[in-house]
């Protein structure tokens, strides 16, 4: 999964 902030 990609974590983007």
Curated annotation (Swiss-Prot):
Name under which the protein is recorded: Major pollen allergen Jun v 4
Keywords from the UniProt entry: Allergen
Organism this protein belongs to: Juniperus virginiana
């Amino acid at each position: 999964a990609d974590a983007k902030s």
